[in-house]
Amino acid sequence: MKIVSPVLLGLSLAVVGSSFAAAQDTQSPQTQNPQMQNQQMQSMKMQSMQMQGPPKVLQITREFIKPGKSGAIHDKSESNFVQAMAKAKWPTHYVAMNSLSGKLRALYITGYASFDAWEKDNAAIDKNKALSAELDKDSVTDGELLDGIDQAVLYYDPDLSYRPPTSLANVRFMEISVVKIKPGHRKDFSDAVKMVIDANKKGGTSSQWAVFELAYGGGDEYVFFSADKSMAEIDTGYAEDKKFRDALGDDGLKKLTELEQACVDSSDSELFQINPRQSYPPDDWVKADPNFWTPKAAMAPAEKPAVKPLPAAKMPPR
């Protein structure tokens, strides 16, 4: 029986990894002359490169996949969206990840520097008739593979985050922990997380995480994102638990347990694997690991050679 949730104890937070794609804070290219579009796209790329830390706003689309429709079947469907964005040279990127625990589902995460930047990106897509039409068509095809779909919008909380990096280029797995807070207990939750941060600092663990507050799409919840370059880093996280507990001490553990009981209504941790075939990564990720981010398309099965008819059997003489 767990007396303290793994979220607050940092069991699922000891990682070496990163947060999300840098976001854009200017309007995406619309129907303009090619020179104007190119200038605007270059400006947005420069701003993306200059942004440090996680984006302020995350827009997450969650797709629930029908049994038997995941894997290569869903990859092929999602690649249509990726190809459409690449053809339009769209400067807003997103990362896809598939569940390794819980219900079969996929997440598509896009980062923005602000809500205003998100609005401008949506408006620009609407004005790009060719891209809009292609995305609408692809949505119909993809919808046939899904059991359901929902969306959420998160807002970054730097005070509750701990050493959040800036790139997913070398990350392969994502641990996502959702903590639902009891009404009126935000202060207790903040105090608990800050205790966890201090204990990780004192214990010298490898922990890193980014925390986002659920802005739209649910209740009073916080989401922890912890990135892993490999599953070996998950092993490291559990192995470092003793460092964390020793740094916290018996009195600290007791206080943390009391805070958790006071403020946490429920918590859940799930593991996801990043899927490059369904992602539209920024150029710097691709340059960092081109073999991962530009996987070869699955080859179609080779055609079987035509079967030659067997010669007619000779009839014995009568």
Question: What is the predicted function of each stretch?
Answer:
Residues 8-18:
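Bacterial N-terminal signal peptides
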